[in-house]
């Protein structure tokens, strides 16, 4: 049966995803940035509250995946923290300036991660040669690759996803970006063994008082009176489809 990983931006969301049938949690902060490293406090709370495997993302900032020496040093420290807290895996990725997997840095990441299962995230979708990257990451010992098939959504990238799955079992190809109940059968039919979904929606803030004209965001149009949360019904429906597909 295919594995359902749900991207969560809080411990409360992780609890809801677990309750509704997720198999694994990717734990992140900052949904507007596509996911950044969660705080130490969130990580500790997740270890205490969640029984499912939780894989925190290690990503120091938004934007591209070519990092300064200081940023990369921080990543290694965060990886050691994730390992020391007892998580079974983590999600990360680095590229060089030419869009290739940064092999020297990935070797340091793998050494810092030790026994943890490492997922190479959607930095893969920005690399120059995905086929070579798949081979390189397999040689490095990366467990899985999260990918949209180098397209804006995994549905649009299904051709490359299918090709990479056919190339071999290692690293595992996990389809993600726009995966939901409505298109889940497409991925199951293609032989995808792991799918990744945010399965989420935006909820309004509980703030009754709102100060107009003052923003904490660099984007003056950002709506700061809402938060992203897992939609438990969406998770449950995806799990139902996966379970029925097995039979």
UniProtKB/Swiss-Prot annotation:
Disulfide bonds: none annotated. Transmembrane segments: none annotated. It is found in: Cytoplasm. GO terms for molecular function: copper ion binding. Keywords: Cytoplasm. The keyword Cytoplasm applies. One of its GO terms (cellular component) is cytoplasm. It comes from the Bacteria. InterPro entries: CutC-like, CutC-like_dom_sf. Pfam families: CutC. Belongs to the CutC family. This is PF03932 family protein CutC. The lineage of its organism: Bacteria, Pseudomonadati, Pseudomonadota, Gammaproteobacteria, Enterobacterales.
């Amino acid at each position: 049966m295919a594995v359902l990983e749900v991207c969560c931006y809080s411990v409360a969301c992780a609890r809801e995803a677990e309750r509704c049938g997720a198999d694994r949690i990717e734990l992140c902060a900052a949904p507007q940035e596509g996911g950044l490293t969660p705080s130490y406090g969130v990580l500790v709370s997740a270890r205490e509250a969640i029984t499912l495997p939780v894989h925190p993302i290690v990503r120091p900032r938004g934007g591209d995946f070519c990092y300064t020496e200081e940023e990369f040093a921080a990543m290694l420290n965060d990886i050691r923290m994730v390992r020391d807290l007892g998580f079974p895996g983590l999600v990360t990725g680095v590229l060089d300036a030419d869009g290739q997997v940064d092999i020297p840095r990935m070797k340091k990441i793998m050494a810092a991660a030790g026994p943890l299962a490492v997922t190479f995230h959607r930095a893969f979708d920005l690399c120059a040669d995905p086929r070579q990257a798949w081979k390189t990451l397999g040689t490095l010992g990366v467990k899985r690759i999260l990918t949209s098939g180098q397209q804006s959504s995994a549905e649009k990238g299904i051709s490359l996803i299918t090709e990479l799955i056919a190339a071999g079992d290692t690293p595992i190809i996990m389809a993600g970006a726009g995966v939901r109940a409505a298109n889940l059968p497409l991925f199951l039919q293609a032989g995808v063994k792991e799918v990744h979904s945010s399965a989420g929606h935006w909820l309004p803030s509980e703030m009754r008082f709102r100060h107009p004209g003052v923003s904490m965001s660099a984007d003056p149009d950002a709506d700061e009176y809402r938060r992203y949360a897992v939609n438990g019904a969406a998770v449950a429906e995806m799990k139902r489809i996966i379970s029925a597909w097995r039979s």
